[in-house]
Amino acid sequence: MSKRDGREVDPDRLYLLSSTSQGYAWLLKLFCDPGDYVLTPRPGYPMVDQLAMLEAVEVDNYFLSWDGAWLTDVGQLRQHLQTSTPSALVVINPNNPTGSYLRPDERAGMVQLCHDFSVPLIADEVFFDYALSNVFRERLAGEERVLTFALDGLSKNLAAPHAKVAWLEVSGPDELVRQAQEKLDQIADAYLPMSDLITAQLPSLLDAIGSQIETVRDRLRKNLQRLRSCVAASRTGVMDLYEPEGGWSALLRFPAWIDEDELVTSLIRDAAISAQPGYFFDMPTAGFLSISLLLQPEVMAAAAESVIARIDTAVEATLF
């Protein structure tokens, strides 16, 4: 991590976990009593909501809006914090499913808000190294101005769902870190997620990250270009691709009157293609599909053509 980020990472501030989900669960235990709430992004991955529910913790949202890029209204977030203080602020960098990285002003604004209102910052950065463009990006891991908990893991870095090892880095003002680690150590001691069987394999797995990320990122970028081409070739021209800046998926926008469930189930039934409907992620409106970019290139090309053709056919059926 020190080599990757170009900074000194203190191993005493690192926790090994069985998964990032476990990291979330630990942090919810650390900061929340039953009935407390955390702030999470919307659109966003539903896993955080599910984990919060299991800890009897509520979830409220701050919002990303699309204006040619996904943007966070930091001013609106400040207004929220002025009326109610969450137990923690969750940031997904880059976001899933939007694929948007925090912009410099957003990053600075969120750090300042956490400082002003004494709110811990939870940064989920599992997709950080899968940049699909040359957009500015900066990790929150290692942030020193506010109490920060950065999550990352092998399963995303290796694109290997079975590689269930994750890590949590604590950073921030020394006294706040000390107080948090006293309690976090107790939680870690209660769960003991690691064993010698797992840690013995870590060096070789960590060594493989660089080349694996490069291989996967190359596929993601090529598949994104294939999807762009298919959208551009649409017979009806009613679809838009909301360009991701990073991550493993892309959002396809289509007319909202096309039922997402019907579209997804018909793709599974008739073409053996699986995509995720937008409402899985609390998209602001109907008419979205989240499409994986991880497929083998030849599979991706055929699948993208089938999805676009299916939507074109639905639109044409209403016009003629």
Model-derived regions, located:
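PLP-dependent enzyme catalytic core of the Aspartate aminotransferase-like
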Residues: 79, 266-275, 281-320
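Helix C-cap/helix->beta junction micro-motif
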Residues: 55, 84, 116-117, 271, ...
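Active-site phosphate-binding strand-loop segment of PLP-dependent enzymes
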Residues: 68-137
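Hydrophobic residues in well-ordered beta-strands that form the structural core
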Residues: 40, 61, 123, 275-277
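Conserved core segment of the aminotransferase class I/II
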Residues: 142-221
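Conserved glycine-rich beta-strand-loop-beta hairpin in the small C-terminal domain of fold type I
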Residues: 203, 218-228, 240-253, 285
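PLP-dependent aminotransferase-like
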Residues: 29-91, 104
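Phosphate-binding glycine-rich loop
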Residues: 1-37, 257-261
